[in-house]
Amino acid sequence: MTAILVTGYRSFELGIFSEKDKRVAIIKKAIKRDLIAYLEEGVDWFIFTGNLGFEQWALEVANDLKKTYPLKTATIFAFETHGSTWNDRNQQHLQQFRATDFVKYSYPSYESPKQLKSYHHFLIHNTDGAYLFYDSEHETRLSYLVAAMKEQPCYPLSFLNFERLNDIADE
């Protein structure tokens, strides 16, 4: 069994506030290519953390790919309270994460930064690599997880970046 952690920018960090934004289609096109490549290499699980944006779009693509590939999806939330303050539209996206093949919560609620460090450790040590939409020139709080991943020997990271998206948009 091979499991890949999928994470990246949240929609608001990209300035995307509508599913109709043309950038979403370009991002999904890149995701589809990359997930198919992973599946052809033998990956069977894609693991998500439940964030809107890149993860949400990757989950949608993975669900479409389930029609032709034998893959499983999982969501490992940091907290049971994840998404509790989201609006109705975003609650629908949250339900997609809760409908994956496996769902687990690390903690009931946030109490200290140690929990996030422990959560990141768990994600890294229970996956075989990561697929990230992240660029170190455009840092977000995801930088803490990326730094922890880079500290691990033999933990492969595959990045989707803005340059590659521009190439896909130009096709």
Swiss-Prot record:
Pfam families: YpsA. InterPro entries: YspA. It comes from the Bacteria. Belongs to the UPF0398 family. This is UPF0398 protein Sez_1569.
